[in-house]
């Protein structure tokens, strides 16, 4: 059974939701763009609390289909101020699909100076204080692997995202747990930061 995970950074809540009927049959880019179009006010500030960051694997995630494990990231772009989708390869897209998560919708903002990381498993999701704030992507992943092991996949933004640089990307780990797959268009890393 697939579902959405809605993460509110202000209240620190993570809530699993049934997928609304109007999203049936959508995945990846189609899903991220539709959610952003319906839920984000087009005149909001891209780096403000009313923007949302949406992660969605494609419909063929967790299958052996070529390119089936890609992941799409959508938001209002700080570069174009329009709906932006950026996608990446790596392991996280397939892992989300295996967990039955069709989309993660991150909304609102944490208090300035607070950094959080999302821990996901089959039946739970929670925000915990970040242990990797201030680290570059490679150092952050190395530290996360020490904590969570090598059977996970990781998503990081590094310093560029933390500083909300509008060209910042989001890094996704590959099979060797290197953060070398990037969603690099539209400044999505700045929105995550």
Give the residues covered by each predicted segment.
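N-terminal basic/disordered segments at the start of proteins
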Residues: 1-40
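A generic structural signal for short, non-catalytic loop/turn and secondary-structure boundary residues
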Residues: 9, 46-50, 66, 111-113, ...
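Short, glycine-/Ser/Thr-/acidic-enriched flexible segments
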Residues: 9-12, 20-21, 60-62, 78-79, ...
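Short helix/loop capping segments that flank catalytic or ligand/cofactor-binding pockets
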Residues: 15, 63-66, 164-166
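Short, solvent-exposed amphipathic alpha-helical segments in soluble enzyme
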Residues: 21-22, 70-71, 171-173
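Conserved oxyanion/phosphate-binding beta-strand-loop segments in alpha/beta enzyme cores
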Residues: 32-69, 151
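Internal mixed beta-strand/loop scaffold within catalytic domains of large alpha/beta enzymes
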Residues: 63-106, 178
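Active-site cavity-forming subdomains of large catalytic enzyme subunits
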Residues: 93-94, 98-193
